Design a protein with these regions (language model features):
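A conserved beta-strand element that flanks and buttresses the S-adenosyl-L-methionine
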Residues: 112
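Conserved class I S-adenosyl-L-methionine
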Residues: 1-47, 60-61, 139-167
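Short catalytic micro-motifs in class I SAM-dependent methyltransferases
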Residues: 115-116
């Protein structure tokens, strides 16, 4: 099933548990450039007054942007649960769709869309909306993964192709360039080392489209090292 399937997205983000498991495992095990820190830096470079984060998840980044940059931050997510969690952090968050943003033209200095655009059915419409709400000379920060993200892991489990990515490391520049005159890609590559079968199985079980492979995880004779390929594409 594709990641831009609305029913899949609704199911995946009705609760935070699976997202929290993926994030906690990845953060604990990754070595190399931290894509979350890279995204924060791209926002901070602009010293923005007004920031919008779409696909805000549990609100960690939105809260940090307001706290550390002193920016006025608004957040949007299609999941009621994610908005609830973000509001609990003190962030002004609303339930909404990136394909039809509830904000006026030229409202924000920076818009953040991290690991969300591959969930959108109509990418062209979504990117046009992101461009619409940005002020002149504003910046969009959009993170996604590469087609070979954690390729060694999926090859081990017999599912080598990155499934369902409509917006990825390879086509991101072309898709964003339809609305933005300049798009720069920065890679945040690293290595994720899974120390044992149970850690790996827990991670796989929490993935969106490959959770059915969890029981196929074999015993590991040595830690499994797999590449993490993430692209940040600021305007």
């Amino acid at each position: 099933m594709r990641l831009d399937n609305p029913l899949l997205v609704q199911w995946e983000y009705a609760s935070e548990e699976r997202l929290a498991t993926r994030n906690a495992t990845y953060r604990a095990l990754v070595e190399g450039t931290n894509p979350e820190e890279l995204a924060f830096r791209f926002v901070a470079e602009r010293a923005p007054k007004d920031v919008l984060e779409v696909g805000c998840g549990t609100g960690e980044l939105a809260e940090r942007l307001g706290r550390e940059l002193g920016a006025t931050v608004k957040a949007l997510d299609i999941s009621h649960r994610m908005v609830e969690l973000t509001r609990a952090r003190g962030v002004d968050a609303v339930v909404g769709d990136v394909q039809q943003l509830p904000y006026a033209d030229a409202s924000f200095d920076v818009v953040v869309a991290n690991w969300v655009l591959y969930h959108v059915p109509d990418l062209d419409r979504a990117v046009a909306e992101l461009a619409r709400v940005l002020r002149p000379q504003g910046r969009l920060v959009a993170a996604t993964v590469g087609h070979d993200h954690m390729g060694e892991l999926w090859t081990l489990l017999g599912d080598a192709a990155t499934s369902g990515l409509s917006f990825d490391h390879d086509n991101g520049i072309e898709l964003l360039s339809r609305q933005f005159a300049r798009v720069d890609r920065h890679e945040a590559n690293g290595t994720v080392s899974f120390p044992d079968r149970e850690t790996l199985r827990t991670f796989v079980a929490a993935t969106t489209t490959r959770s059915h492979l969890a029981d196929a995880v074999p015993e590991l004779r040595e830690p499994l090292r797999t590449r993490s390929v993430v692209a940040e594409e600021p305007r």
